[in-house]
């Protein structure tokens, strides 16, 4: 069987820079370098996404119904749009980082010679009663509780989090408002709108694609490494009893990290083809991409949807990564900048003077086809994915630390490019899209990997970019 080349015919999704399709998000990251017409078009698109303006009969209008030109949108909303995109201070719709909820434990003892007592509803009594409690009935619903020993209580309290920045979707853009979302976790709502953006970016109706392939020649590979941790997923599942609430019938199922693929198959494509969910920490998208290109190269599928969706801006994720010392904190940034006022927009600093990475939410998807089908349909081809390399690190003490697998992965990728394009093309016209996580360890280890691989292939000038500086991790 002739091996087919997987090509990208559509891409889309959303992150802190906005919508990915047609390079809208990329334009936001380089907006300072764009000419005025291109800048104003980008701002107008973001203004619509953020519900600052709307499009009526092909014209931009504000909330009062006044027609706006691109220049007027620029003058009125540019500052607000720029401040409400990319990495920035965490907004209260996600979490109040100055007053994060937690339970404070306090020990209570009675005044000498006096019992400690309180009145409560009978239905609020714990089961079973503590052995040192005495309960006297006051009426049909209330009781008097007397404590004969010291007691420990947990009370609601609030404290500031040391981590205060994240890559958030543009302010005002709510994925769940774009379709009939019922108790869907944020990450799954992002999945629905993200994959829809990618499909529409192909410029070809999905039914037209399906007329050219068999139903089982479509595959979907998508997942999320952190699962769904908001109140509609695992977050609510694990918090409900501790908060005195009830677990719902949806929280467990919707929290699974396989749900992005399931939602795409059931709610968007109606697919009966191959499906799967592969997770691999920061490289989850690439793990799924590897499965996708294997399906096309082997001839098992002709169309593959690949992607991932993460919504980790919640207290649990911030506390967890923060406990590892992995996140950029306000104090760490203050020490780097040498001033009391912190610029949270500069929290993510790949290969620079940094103190940790910056969490971010995003959903990104690509539509792959074999090259023959793409040409038959007249699809726009944005690029090819001939291979994805993933290697383990062998024996090591720290799972998160880099190892020999990183060197093998990068070297194999460069060798593959040399085989396809020739050594001159790689030496003179290639660049590296680095992981660039913005941790002190990464800036050293990844730099060493790139330097040693470049030396092995005699690459003297190798441009390196790290988009996490704009959109977070």
Predicted regions and their residues:
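Conserved small-residue
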Residues: 195, 220, 285, 292, ...
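Condensing-enzyme catalytic core mediating Claisen C-C bond formation in acyl metabolism
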Residues: 5-12, 16, 332-425, 430-431
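Hydrophobic alpha-helical hairpins/lids featuring a short glycine-rich hinge
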Residues: 188-248
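Acyl-CoA/ACP chain-elongation machinery
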Residues: 300-355, 388-402, 436-443, 461, ...
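ACP-dependent fatty acid/polyketide chain-elongation machinery
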Residues: 1-180, 372-384
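Active-site-proximal alpha-helical scaffold in enzymes
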Residues: 190-204, 257, 261, 268, ...
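Conserved catalytic cysteine-centered active-site region
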Residues: 47, 142, 147-189, 227-291, ...
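Short, well-ordered amphipathic alpha-helical segments that serve as non-catalytic structural scaffolds
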Residues: 190-203, 258-261, 288, 370, ...
